[in-house]
Amino acid sequence: MEALHQKIREEGIVLSDQVLKVDAFLNHQIDPALMQLIGDEFARLFADAGVTKIVTIEASGIAPAVMTGLKLGVPVIFARKHQSLTLTENLLTASVYSFTKQTENTVAISPRHLNSSDRVLVIDDFLANGKASQALISIIKQAGATVAGLGIVIEKSFQGGRAELDSQGYRVESLARVKSLEGGVVSFIE
């Protein structure tokens, strides 16, 4: 997606050979016009997938997920990282390790929002080692629902997440596939 590539080149900051900071438009400050384009593109890519729900993890996946849900006309559920007084009943949970935050979290979704008839599209801001995607897939399976595919805003292709999801037979559509961050330069798989 050229608009996303351009935004990454202009406003992304390479912090190391492993870390790309995109807080100027995706995961701190949000560019609504770009999110709309991202939602439109995911909706186009998954128009034939029979999606009934979208699942993401709070917080950075919410903006692209909501825009995709708006375009597809389906609800968006975000897995919560923090306990809530209102989120208590027989939760669907999975453990996820965050590469950038170097922490382990338990994420949870209420079983009231997913059921066995759902075809679920996973939307996330990044795909690196695939731990967040695997956690969401686990929750979807716990509900007896079907994974319709995964929509990733930025994939770090040099890490193993994509290969693992591919080997499990999941459909993965990434809007920007980063080949390398070496030398402080973002290079894409075209």
Curated annotation (Swiss-Prot):
Molecular function terms, GO-annotated: xanthine phosphoribosyltransferase activity
Residues annotated for xanthine binding in this entry: L20, N27, K156
Entry binding sites for 5-phospho-alpha-D-ribose 1-diphosphate: A128, N129, G130, K131, A132
UniProt-listed SUPFAM superfamilies: PRTase-like
One of the protein's GO biological processes: purine ribonucleoside salvage
First and last residue of the signal peptide: none
Record's catalysed reaction(s): XMP + diphosphate = xanthine + 5-phospho-alpha-D-ribose 1-diphosphate
Subcellular location per the Swiss-Prot or TrEMBL entry: Cytoplasm
Pathway: Purine metabolism; XMP biosynthesis via salvage pathway; XMP from xanthine: step 1/1
EC code(s) of this entry: 2.4.2.22
Similarity comment: family membership: Belongs to the purine/pyrimidine phosphoribosyltransferase family. Xpt subfamily.
SUBUNIT field: Homodimer.
Protein name per Swiss-Prot or TrEMBL: Xanthine phosphoribosyltransferase
